[in-house]
Amino acid sequence: MSGLFITFEGPEGAGKTTVLQEMKEILSAEGLPVTATREPGGIDIAEQIREVILNKNNTLMDAKTEALLYAAARRQHLAEKVQPALKEGRIVLCDRFIDSSLAYQGYARGLGIDEVLSINQFAIGDTMPDVTIYFSIEPEEGLKRITSNDSREKNRLDLEALHFHTKVREGYQKVMQRFPERFHTIDASKKKELVIQDALQVINEALKKIQL
């Protein structure tokens, strides 16, 4: 019995992390086996790599170095946490996965979507998300949310200029055109309760198609 791999994607400030935690609580309350995790991170080695990637003092980091570090963290996270959970038949909710690398490093950093896809295919093999929920929000609104959130520690990506975040959004559009069958777009500018409702609807539809 295989599990269900659901990834949450979107630009900075879209609110996907908050919604993911809500989804975990709702699904767990229904008695479903759920594993919630994040990238980069989720396990000790990947969390250590995360600290290097997002450290705001690492301003000299080369774009290729950044892409390779993400892929390395992804591989370890996948092998140590995601794949075992899926083999156990669990629902895995993951805050970011390969599409973040394609949008951020492939497009916004200018490395090329195909090039970054190649790096990540080596890292993840044939393990791709069953469903990807994209939280759509204008870059200006996302940055505004980040700035007004005093409880959020600003990382290196948060501090990028508006132009970069605009490119990230464009990158996601390119990625969604490439993998339309698994992407579901949600308007993340709506009230949190409505966004949660929309995300739950996507997940429930996916659950109907499998037997957990």
Swiss-Prot record:
UniProt: ATP binding residues: 10-17
Cellular component annotations (GO), alphabetically ordered: cytosol
EC number per UniProt: 2.7.4.9
InterPro entries, sorted: P-loop_NTPase, Thymidylate_kin-like_dom, Thymidylate_kin_CS, Thymidylate_kinase
Identification of the protein by name: Thymidylate kinase
Keyword Hydrolase: no
Superkingdom of this protein's organism: Bacteria
Pfam families: Thymidylate_kin
Enzyme class: transferase
Taxonomic placement: Bacteria, Bacillati, Bacillota, Bacilli, Bacillales
Function: Phosphorylation of dTMP to form dTDP in both de novo and salvage pathways of dTTP synthesis.
Reaction catalysed by this enzyme: dTMP + ATP = dTDP + ADP
PANTHER family linked to this entry: THYMIDYLATE KINASE (PTHR10344), UMP-CMP KINASE 2, MITOCHONDRIAL (PTHR10344:SF4)
A single GO molecular function term of this UniProt record: ATP binding
Record carries keyword Disulfide bond: no
NCBIfam families: DTMP_kinase (TIGR00041)
GO biological process, one term: dUDP biosynthetic process
Family: Belongs to the thymidylate kinase family.
Keywords, ordered alphabetically: ATP-binding, Kinase, Nucleotide biosynthesis, Nucleotide-binding, Transferase
